[in-house]
Every structure is written in structure tokens, then in C-alpha cells.
């Protein structure tokens, strides 16, 4: 790469969150940084976009550095769409999202605004990485993450794969730097949330609910999964894509004779 890369930074915890500030500082070492991020927390919004509602985007300066910054009233995906179409001087060389406060491993990826932002970038043909730290604390320590964040982003910037867009989901264990054992390339663990709703009543007797639940890892001892890597002190990297086609079932379905099925139901 001959020119200085343009790096788009976003997140779902909001533009003032410590995680994105740590990411911005790291990315300033690697290129020209443009931050377009939500003006308030947007955790768990997934791939939602703003429709039938006005979208605001204002230039701001959150802290020191050479980065240019905008805060957006919409979702993380809104931020990426708006940045690419209306804010950046050209298509970014990479989009990075995070560093999220909390895990986006395994099934959590389906709900994540952090990961949805990089999926949106990949739809536009932009290499992208979502970073998450397994620490929900607002004052989480992001220092141990910075070395690995820079290393991963540099690898993508300077080692492109022809005809392929790299999109990665990276999760970092809550450990001191010297305790992190390294990086594991993994698959997404089979998991789910066993959820319930805590039913309550407000002072006027109106019913309301709090979502609660327990995380269930269905691949508990599978060493090739992101959950195993994180549990055992490794950073997990899972390559992801927006194509949700189930190719295993695809060929089976092609063998079905739908005309015969149609005739059968007409005759019954």
C-alpha cells in the first residue's frame, strides 16, 4: 500500500465509550482515521437501520489526536452507510468497530451492533474487523488489547487476499498482557441464550418486563471454537460473511421434487 490508508472507526457503545477511544488512539498510528459513531449506546441493535426518522450527524472532537470525528443519531450500520456515502473523501481501506465492552463471541454475533457495522462494510467491499473485550465494565482496561488490535489491522491492510473481502470477528479475553497466550483462528461456537422475562408492575399497575437469561455453550470442549480459545486465554479470530446460505442443505433441497409434492397435496 503506497498511500496512507483511510481507516473508518465505529462502534455500538457510543462515541465517548472508552473502548472506541482506545481503538481510535491505536488506529492513529496506522493511517488517516475517520470516526463516525453513535451519539448514544446502541448495544444489541444488530443490523438495524434508521427509517422514517430523521438522521442527524454532527462533527465533534472528543479527545486529542489527528482523527476527524462525527457523532450520529442512528445505529452502527447507519454510521457506516453514512460515512461511506457522504462523509469520507473516498472508500476506506478498512473499517474497524469496537472495542466493544463485552463479548461478541459465538451466538452473540447475531445481536451485535459492533459486528453488524463491519458486516455492512463488507457488503460494500471493504475489509473490516470487529473487536470486543470480555469486560462489560465502563472502566475496562483496554491497554492489553492495543498491541493485538494494531497487529491484526496491519495484517489485513498489507496482506490483502485477491477477490476476497476479509471480515473478522475478534474477541479478547479479560487478562493482563502477559497472561494472553496468543491468537487462535477459530470457528463460531454452537451456543444460545436461554432467556426469560422478569415480569414486574409499575406504581400504576402497568406490566413491564426485564429480559434475563443464561448463556449456554453447546460446544463446551470443542478446541476449535472461539469460546474454547477465550476460556483458555487466547484471542479468538473468526472469519465471517454476510452470505447466510446453508450450503449443506442447498444441495439436498435441489434433490427435492417440488412438482411431485405439489401434486400430492392437490390429491389429498
Task: Describe the predicted segments one by one.
Residues 83-89, 116-127:
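Alpha-helix C-terminal capping segments
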Residues 103-112:
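Glycine/threonine-rich flexible loop motifs
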Residues 34-36, 70, 129-131, 168-170, ...:
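Hydrophobic/aromatic beta-strand patches that form the interior of the parallel beta-sheet core
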Residues 265-266:
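Short hydrophobic targeting helices and cationic amphipathic motifs
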Residues 94:
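Short, Asp-centered acidic motifs that coordinate Mg2+ and/or phosphate
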Residues 143-261:
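Electrostatically charged, flexible surface regions
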Residues 2-3, 7-10, 18-86, 90-91:
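A cross-family phosphate/adenosyl-ligand binding-site feature
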Residues 122-144:
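Glycine-rich phosphate/pyrophosphate-binding loops
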